């Protein structure tokens, strides 16, 4: 099972790849080559930074169609932080920008009246049962760094929510796609458990 962490110039990917290796992903490659990404069994899209810049970089690297095709084929996909937001149709971060459009919905600023960006530990509240959440309990803490939140059209994709001024979507799951607004690689044991659970799901999808 070959896992490719997509490097599109948005953030330090070493901690993500090391966390994946730590939970037993057998072959983890960090690459910005669309040919390498197109042959992956598992794709991981991490990232921090601006939505518009991210989409521009993905397009210039010919990775947009690779990501869409990978997901359409039913192969395992993991999005982290900006990698969750990019799955949606559009974002209003510094203007209006089109996303990958895998999921219907948009990306908007966190609510007024809270400190932005949202940095630090916060709790997960479960919205549905999933193997991804095995070994975790309601109220467990994970680590966030973000200013924007996703608003899915279809609430059934929502895996967890988190309270920051009001409840926002902190993770989603739809078939072969799992994505976290928080950083599992920075969330210590709970984060590694989530990645381990994703690995188990990925193994089922690739055998």
From Swiss-Prot:
<dbReference type="GO" id="GO:0016829">
    <property type="term" value="F:lyase activity"/>
</dbReference>
<protein>
    <recommendedName>
        <fullName>Imidazole glycerol phosphate synthase subunit HisH</fullName>
        <ecNumber>4.3.2.10</ecNumber>
        <ecNumber>3.5.1.2</ecNumber>
    </recommendedName>
</protein>
<feature type="domain" description="Glutamine amidotransferase type-1">
    <location>
        <begin position="2"/>
        <end position="207"/>
    </location>
</feature>
<keyword id="KW-0456">Lyase</keyword>
<comment type="function">
    <text>IGPS catalyzes the conversion of PRFAR and glutamine to IGP, AICAR and glutamate. The HisH subunit catalyzes the hydrolysis of glutamine to glutamate and ammonia as part of the synthesis of IGP and AICAR. The resulting ammonia molecule is channeled to the active site of HisF.</text>
</comment>
<dbReference type="InterPro" id="IPR010139">
    <property type="entry name" value="Imidazole-glycPsynth_HisH"/>
</dbReference>
<comment type="pathway">
    <text>Amino-acid biosynthesis; L-histidine biosynthesis; L-histidine from 5-phospho-alpha-D-ribose 1-diphosphate: step 5/9.</text>
</comment>
<dbReference type="Pfam" id="PF00117">
    <property type="entry name" value="GATase"/>
</dbReference>
<dbReference type="GO" id="GO:0004359">
    <property type="term" value="F:glutaminase activity"/>
</dbReference>
<keyword id="KW-0378">Hydrolase</keyword>
<keyword id="KW-0963">Cytoplasm</keyword>
<dbReference type="GO" id="GO:0005737">
    <property type="term" value="C:cytoplasm"/>
</dbReference>
<comment type="subunit">
    <text>Heterodimer of HisH and HisF.</text>
</comment>
<dbReference type="GO" id="GO:0000105">
    <property type="term" value="P:L-histidine biosynthetic process"/>
</dbReference>
<keyword id="KW-0368">Histidine biosynthesis</keyword>
<feature type="active site">
    <location>
        <position position="185"/>
    </location>
</feature>
<feature type="active site">
    <location>
        <position position="183"/>
    </location>
</feature>
<dbReference type="GO" id="GO:0000107">
    <property type="term" value="F:imidazoleglycerol-phosphate synthase activity"/>
</dbReference>
<feature type="active site" description="Nucleophile">
    <location>
        <position position="81"/>
    </location>
</feature>
<keyword id="KW-0315">Glutamine amidotransferase</keyword>
<keyword id="KW-0028">Amino-acid biosynthesis</keyword>
<dbReference type="InterPro" id="IPR017926">
    <property type="entry name" value="GATASE"/>
</dbReference>
<dbReference type="InterPro" id="IPR029062">
    <property type="entry name" value="Class_I_gatase-like"/>
</dbReference>
């Amino acid at each position: 099972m070959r896992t490719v962490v997509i490097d599109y110039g948005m953030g330090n990917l070493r901690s993500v790849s090391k966390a994946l290796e730590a939970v037993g992903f057998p072959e983890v490659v960090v690459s910005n080559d669309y040919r390498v990404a197109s042959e992956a069994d598992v794709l991981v899209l991490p990232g921090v930074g601006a939505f518009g810049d991210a989409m521009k970089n993905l397009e210039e690297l010919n990775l947009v169609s690779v990501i869409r095709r990978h997901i359409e084929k039913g192969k395992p996909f993991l999005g982290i932080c900006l990698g969750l937001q990019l799955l949606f149709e559009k974002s209003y971060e510094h203007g209006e920008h089109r996303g990958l459009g895998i999921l219907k919905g948009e990306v908007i600023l966190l609510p007024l009246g809270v400190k932005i960006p949202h940095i630090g530990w916060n709790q997960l509240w479960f919205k549905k049962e999933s193997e991804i959440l095995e070994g975790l309990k309601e109220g467990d803490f994970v680590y966030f760094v973000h200013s924007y939140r996703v608003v899915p059209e279809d609430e059934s994709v929502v895996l967890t929510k988190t309270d920051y001024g009001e409840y926002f979507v902190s993770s989603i799951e739809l078939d072969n796609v799992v994505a976290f607004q928080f950083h599992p690689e920075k969330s210590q044991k709970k984060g590694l458990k989530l990645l381990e659970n994703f690995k188990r799901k990925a193994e089922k999808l690739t055998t």
